[in-house]
Amino acid sequence: TENRQDTSVSMCAVVKGYPLVIRNSDNPERRFGIPFDSPLFHWYSTRDMRRQLRAYLKEAFGIAPDVADRALEQARAAQAQFKGELVAAGRDVLSRVELENGYAIALASRPYHNDPLVNHDIDTLITSLGIPVLPPDAIPGVNDVDLRNSLIDVVNNFHARMLGSAVIAASCPHLEYVQLVSFG
């Protein structure tokens, strides 16, 4: 996991519950005739990830462990490449707004806010005003911010990215911070 804080032991209950909501409201198996898998994994280490994925892929799809291992390595390489490209693009945006004496917005949220029906297309509204929007993952150094002295409990990766991007935005004159919140 990217967030190694001692308090990082849980996953957002809303995120965990989303598969149940989708299964009961949209019922993709009945409506579209496709299986709807929603396995729950607890990956405290790379070893846990490998073991749990091997077991799930073998049971659900009959995929041999060595094939699962190769797929996992390819997925990890692709994810690392994507993260590198995302941060490079974020760095480019921040350089551009600094040159133009403008600003970008770090739009922080939980995963379910990626749904346009939940976020009401706030990112599109902001970009329509000519203001670049960056997800916290695109902000250089977001995973390097020391959060140990935070008064906020950093209980999962979303909290770490939201708080890390807020700390960076607070010290960057060309980056504003907006956090989407659905409740309390």
Regions found by a protein language model. Name each.
Residues 1-184:
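An N-terminal assembly and electron-transfer interface module characteristic of large anaerobic redox
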